[in-house]
Each structure stands twice: as structure tokens, then as C-alpha cells.
């Protein structure tokens, strides 16, 4: 049963509804919510084996059940502003984005700007065949691959934007497993800082049910 809950859609949604109803949010929930409201690029990087679309359904549920109407309006406005600033899509699309229903705008953002990495899933294994060897047995490797892939996505969008500024990139990562926290810190210091020297990395260590903020950069 535990393994089914780790992979199947219905138990995941049921668990999420239970947590929402009982306000059982993790230490980084407000930071996650803030990132969505500001329409930032976001990644969910988990050892779960669900399909990525299950996680998207979960994020939509969080928005529907935990955001106020005012927070939703601010989020929609920020989504529109971010796409207009980036010039990622043509003017016709941008005009349609400004005139569409709020739910459709949020859904587009959740498809385009939010990445869902379920590192124990078949989807993940198929997407990163050349880089992994049974990542389901090694979530550490899977999470490292996901982090690197997400950073590449962010940088590609920045390079395409009207005014790329690589000195203002901040990457935050939240983790509640101490062993994984240490592994990701080590990975950033030994590899990612050399590849991306201008990125400001922030690790939120939630391993003791409270948040310890760790900053890693070359500044």
C-alpha cells in the first residue's frame, strides 16, 4: 500500500486534500506559495514515482484551496507581466494571454514555467536515459540531474529574453532529508558553482521541521 501511495494518483490527491484541510504544510510552503504568486519558474523535485501530471494536479489544487481571490489576481497579473517582459511569444499570443480566463492563464503557466521531476517514475527514467542508471534506486542522482536540467531551462529563457541579466539569478532548493541536503550542497559547491559562477544558490534545510537557510555563491 505504501508503494502504491508513492506512485498512484488517487492516494496522492487524497493525502493532499487531508493536509490542506488540516493545515499540515511543510516549513517551505509559504516560500513555495510566494514563488507561484510571483509567477517565478518553479520546479518540484521529488523522489516520488507519480506521473508529472499528478504533481501539476496537486499544484492546481493548492492554488484553488489555499490562495485567496486577491492572491490569484496578483498571480495572474504577474504571469501576464512576465511573459510580456520576456518576449518569449509573439504579440498575438500575448494579447490572447491578457484577455483569457484566469484559470486558463494559470494553467498555461503551470505547463510552461513549472517543471515536475518525479525521479522514481518511468517518465523521468525515459526523459534522462543517457544520464541515469536506475535512478529509482538512487534519488540523490535523480535530484541532481533534475536541478541541473531546471537551471538550463531557466537560463535558456533568460538568454531569449529582451534584457538578459545573468547577475540577478537566484536558485532556491528546499529539502527535508538531511542526507540529501548535504549531497545537494556538496554538488553545488563542487560542480554547479563552476558551471554557473553567477548564480546565487539558496538551500532551505527543513530536516528538523524548521528551516535553516544556507547561501552558496561566489560573491
Describe each model-derived feature in a short phrase:
Residues 117-118, 123-149, 153:
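Alpha-helical scaffold elements lining the catalytic groove of polysaccharide deacetylases
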Residues 35-40, 54, 73, 159-168, ...:
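Short helix-terminating capping/connector loops at secondary-structure junctions
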Residues 143-179:
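Conserved Lys-Pro-Asp/Glu-containing loop-to-beta segment of HAD-superfamily phosphomonoesterases
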Residues 42-46, 170-176, 202-206:
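Extended hydrophobic secondary-structure segments that form protein cores and membrane-embedded regions
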Residues 165-167, 179-219:
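Asp-based, Mg2+/Mn2+-dependent phosphohydrolase catalytic module
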Residues 1-131:
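Alpha-helical substrate-recognition element adjacent to the catalytic core
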Residues 9-12, 72, 147, 151, ...:
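Short amphipathic alpha-helical segments that mediate assembly, nucleic-acid/protein binding
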